[in-house]
């Protein structure tokens, strides 16, 4: 029976006889003495087999190879001074193997090296196909255990400190598409009808508040059939919370304490409370996005009022057509950013184009304080306009000013992308810095140009600000997002709990009373039976752990992720199904493979 994990052994264990299980990380023969690095999920320890001191284990030790599974019993001893290894926690001790038992070998060539000593970069498709090997590697084992520690801290705080209870909500539910596409499943028992996998437990957790379970949480699986990016998966995990009888301030305060507890427990970091706050309008004005990375400055400057009478037609027309003109000031930008990079074909021009911009204007501040730019801009700005630009941006000799002009959405998107790209290039981002902030006072709705209608910016169950009930179309939402180093890691709101307000919101987003009743009648009826004021939040667990682990993709903190084509390379899912199954489900496929 196992007595210890490999990575647990320290000097205090010297003299003990231990039994370990694990994989041979690597084997070395030094002058007839066999050294094995034995690995399990906790780490590595060195095992020694000497023909003189441990003759019973020597022959088998000599035959072992990488990734063989073994049981080893032996005595913990002090390593000689010359072989101490300060790079690993067990580097002061080693095990003299009295007994080795081979539990299983390796019958095929490894597709990649698993050993912690190997620094080879392995293709991601191989890592995902042979995930069981990838998860043995130190980096992945640490990430999965870190994920467990985060979840454990969440549960401990919510249950032991705040009195929340964990409630499971259904995975098979009805389709209420408002946003991303649902994953749908045919019902065999009810032919012609369909279940949907939940995009979130939103409606069920609100029903739980109606039920009197006033502090709910769940580690919830969610499903969205959407285009995938580096930080998205078709199935993902949330910490989902809902609470009754709490104001927006009280919900935010509770969540700051929760997040602070997680950081202290998992990372050993004390976070200053309360977290800073930005309104949505401030975030968009200063950073061009609603999830700004505030580890570095590079704030945008709005000069629309200065440019409305500009002689430069591009700037003047942008303001006249209801758009904006903004500047991204870059200290020392003259030295590092050439005109070639800003003009068509350059990397910064390309970055701007991908955000929808048609061009990229600039002004350079020379060492003598004069400005340098293309003639069309320089000749069409008055001296007063030039001085106002320099004053507002705080530009000094060496500054580069990049302009965005046009509709607000495109300008903000363009300058946000450029801000992030330049911060990385200039080394302005401290990877060890932790900046958390709340973004509050979101608009209730945004305009969907494709469908020519308003849609909820968060979701249609978000409560409007009580001061804005007279005009829902321009109302602020009682919504709040938690931003961690430029990533939204949590989003929540106070909820609508009165039927008439909910019906007004449905009408505003274009749902007829009949559609609202068909999709959400059960919720509207629940509001007739004494619904308490309530609100909540959901945290993206995958994204939060990714940031804790210092990874760049959530695929590296999920045990069995999908690819960006929504495929599982390990099991080769999704796959076809037997025709008999389709008949039982009364389903036929119209898909015709391309020849």
Swiss-Prot record:
Record's keyword annotation contains Transmembrane: no
Gene Ontology BP, a term: aspartyl-tRNA aminoacylation
EC number from the UniProt entry: 6.1.1.23
Keyword line: Aminoacyl-tRNA synthetase, ATP-binding, Cytoplasm, Ligase, Nucleotide-binding, Protein biosynthesis
UniProt binding sites for L-aspartate: 178, 224, 458, 495
Main location: cytoplasm
One GO molecular-function entry: aspartate-tRNA(Asn) ligase activity
Residue segments, region Aspartate: 202-205
Binding site for ATP: 224-226, 233, 488, 540-543
An annotated GO cellular component: cytoplasm
Annotated SUPFAM superfamilies: Class II aaRS and biotin synthetases, GAD domain-like, Nucleic acid-binding proteins
Catalysis: reaction(s): tRNA(Asx) + L-aspartate + ATP = L-aspartyl-tRNA(Asx) + AMP + diphosphate
InterPro entries tied to this protein: Aa-tRNA-synt_II, aa-tRNA-synth_II, aa-tRNA-synth_II/BPL/LPL, Asp-tRNA-ligase_1, Asp-tRNA-ligase_1_N, Asp/Asn-tRNA-synth_IIb, AspRS_core, GAD-like_sf
Broad enzyme group: ligase
Site note Important for tRNA non-discrimination, residues: 30
Location(s), subcellular: Cytoplasm
Protein purpose: Aspartyl-tRNA synthetase with relaxed tRNA specificity since it is able to aspartylate not only its cognate tRNA(Asp) but also tRNA(Asn). Reaction proceeds in two steps: L-aspartate is first activated by ATP to form Asp-AMP and then transferred to the acceptor end of tRNA(Asp/Asn).
Protein family (similarity comment): Belongs to the class-II aminoacyl-tRNA synthetase family. Type 1 subfamily.
Record note on quaternary structure: Homodimer.
Name this polypeptide is given: Aspartate--tRNA(Asp/Asn) ligase
UniProt source species: Nostoc sp. (strain PCC 7120 / SAG 25.82 / UTEX 2576)
Origin organism lineage: Bacteria, Bacillati, Cyanobacteriota, Cyanophyceae, Nostocales
